[in-house]
Amino acid sequence: MNEHRGYYAIIPAIVRYDNHLNGNAKLLYGELTALANEKGYCWATNQYFANLYNVSKRTIISWLKQLEERNYIKMQIFYK
């Protein structure tokens, strides 16, 4: 993806030092919170993140599940 937003992502210590999360899930958390700060919620799709990090949607879903299982995020799925 050519366009990268110019904002800071802050990852709280509780997330950074959680040994149940892999490093990429922690990085994704920072991206999620940065996007949520922009509009009050994270509007991006799984495909958006897959393109951003050059991984599959399945990988993004795995990272999101890690974050949800540890209660760092709550997901609502919207279908078009």
Question: Residue spans of the language-model regions?
Answer:
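Short recognition helix of helix-turn-helix/winged-helix DNA-binding domains
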Residues: 1-59, 65-72
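Short, Lys/Arg-rich nucleic-acid/phosphate-binding segment
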Residues: 77-80
